[in-house]
Swiss-Prot record:
Keywords: Calcium, Disulfide bond, Hydrolase, Lipid degradation, Lipid metabolism, Metal-binding, Secreted, Signal. Pfam families: Phospholip_A2_1. It is found in: Secreted. InterPro entries: PLipase_A2, PLipase_A2_Asp_AS, PLipase_A2_dom, PLipase_A2_dom_sf, PLipase_A2_His_AS. Expressed by the venom gland. Its cofactor is Ca(2+). The active site is at 75, 121. Residues 1-19 form the signal peptide. Disulfide bonds join 38-99, 54-146, 56-72, 71-127, 78-120, 88-113, 106-118. It comes from Bungarus flaviceps flaviceps. Binds 1 Ca(2+) ion. This is Acidic phospholipase A2 2.
Length: 147
């Protein structure tokens, strides 16, 4: 075998091995982002909510800093309830929904994991759209501000 071909083949194999150990990314974050954009009419990019206050983004704790942060706390708690359903992983569960003129509708069967997760995201998206956004609460130091 040609050494150049062997080198390319080795690189591909190593790449595939590396990809096999990369954990899957939460699929429904894309859907949640779409629901947020539907509810707020695209007025604020969804990444603004990824690291806001004490609860928006990964994890959460302490006292919410404002109304928007309370929306995130409620969303976290809602996902916690959804996780109690059999085989329900909210961060990886996708669902069916419609967005029409800012109105969000979840279309999966009531009581299903998919519907529960969609309802969590729908309520949060509507809450985000109605809550004031305070720039000073974006990327705060959670260790000192979230007691």
């Amino acid at each position: 075998m040609n050494p150049a071909h062997l080198l390319v083949l080795s690189a591909v194999c190593v790449s595939l091995l590396g990809a096999a150990i990369v954990p899957p990314q939460p699929l429904n974050l894309i859907q949640f982002s779409s629901l947020i954009q539907c509810a707020n009419g695209g007025s604020r990019a969804t990444w603004h909510y990824a690291d806001y206050g004490c609860y928006c983004g990964k994890g959460g704790g302490g006292t919410p800093v404002d109304e928007l942060d309370r929306c995130c706390q409620t969303h976290d708690n809602c996902y916690g309830e959804a996780e109690k359903l059999t085989k329900c992983s909210p961060y990886y569960k996708t669902y069916k929904y419609d967005c029409s003129e800012g109105k969000l509708t979840c279309n999966d069967a009531p009581g299903s994991c998919e519907r529960s997760v969609c309802d969590c995201d729908r309520v949060a998206a509507i809450c985000f759209a109605g809550a004031p956004y305070n720039d000073k609460n974006f990327m705060i130091n959670t260790e000192t501000n979230c007691q």
